[in-house]
Each structure stands twice: as structure tokens, then as C-alpha cells.
Amino acid sequence: MAGIEQIKPIKIQENVSLKDAWLSDIIDEHLEGTMFAPRSGVFHPSVISNPCDRYVWLCYHGKMVDQPLPANLQRIFQNGGFLEDRVGQWLTDLNILIDREVSVKQEIPPISGRIDFLINHYKYGTHPIELKSINTAGFTKLKKPKPEHEIQLQMYLNMGGYDQGTVLYENKNDQKIKTFLLERDSNQWGDILNRCFTIQEMLIPPDKCSGATWCNCRKVEGY
């Protein structure tokens, strides 16, 4: 007779549902597309907020390439659109929404962007709102706006002539919100303009990426 230690435990078979690969595949194929490079000849706030000068140069000079848009990223973009619609409805219900997707431009250097929302703030009057979604890990750490979001809002404040604005974050995991008020900063705006002028004057881009590991400049060869 085998000893107790030699008796193998009986495996309990888990009740695992079959995956419907067909449905997953056709949804993904439907959503896959192309992520087009930013329009050249103009600086966009979402581009300038990237700390990588190489990336900004490539975008401004039309050297960024179109890239495949995977299905999961398309779903992320769609969720962002749904979030904007939800928040827009809240602001409408509160009777404080003035406008959405408000265009702001700068001629020299050429800058073009859109403010997510303009509201009638009880204290500050006409007031820009920059809306962002963020996961729980990032949301928990937020004590002030992320640097790239602060840059975007500062550009809108200075181009639009607004004295204050707010960055509104929604936690994409539990829908809690945080809001951060920003004052217009002419010194920071001056730094942004100087960076734009410097990049305009560069004949070739910097060799190395100075952004995050996911910076898209790493996907461009030949520059």
C-alpha cells in the first residue's frame, strides 16, 4: 500500500466557460483603424505637452507617420468621448455650460487647440475646463494637475485671455472626481512660446527621445 505522502491529490476540475473568439475577433476587426499624425505647420497643445522635443519637431515638420490604431486603444478613445458627453450633460443640467470644444489659436508661433468646456463659474465668470480620465493608481497620487495637463490648460488660458481655469479628473475605475484650479501664468507661457520658437528654428530634430518610453518619436526612422 502506498504511503499517505505518495497519494496524489485529486484535481478538482474548474468549470471554465468557453471563449467566444469569433465575437471578440469581429469586434476588434471592426474597431481597428489608423491613428493619423498631427497636422503639420502648427503646434497643438496635446503635442507641446509632451516633453520630447524630438516628437514635437517631427509633428510640426510633418515627419510623424500614421500608425495602426489597435482596437483596445479605439475603445479608450471612445470612452473619452462618452466621458465628455456625460460631463457636458452635467454642466448643462447645472445651467452653467457656455460652450464645448472652443477653438483657440495663436498666430506667432502658430498654435491651435480646443478647450473642452467653457462654463459660467460662480466666482470667475467665463471659465475653461480641461477634462481628463485617469486610473486609480494615478488618481490616488494626484495632489495637483499632471505637468502635461497643466501645460495644456496654461496654453488655453493664455491664448484665450482667461485668468483661471480648472483641470477636472475622473477616476476611470470608480468615477470619483478631483478638480484643480490654475491661475494664468505668463512666465510659464513665455517658456512654452520660447520652446516653440526653438523647435521651429531647428533644421533637424534631436537625435534622442527625451520623453516617456511610449513616446511615438521612437517609431520614426530616418531622422
Each predicted region: which residue ranges?
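Soluble or luminal CAZymes and related metallo-dependent hydrolases
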Residues: N79-L83, E148, Q188
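A structural signal for short, well-ordered beta-strand segments and their strand-loop junctions
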Residues: D99, P128-E130, Q164-Y169
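Metal-dependent nuclease catalytic cores that hydrolyze phosphodiester bonds in DNA/RNA
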Residues: M1-P128, N135-K141
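Metal-dependent nuclease catalytic regions and adjoining charged, substrate-binding loops involved
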Residues: K141-K146, M159-Y223
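Generic structural marker for isolated residues within well-ordered, non-membrane alpha-helices
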Residues: L153
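Short, histidine-centered active-site or binding-site loop motifs used for metal coordination
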Residues: K132-N135, N171
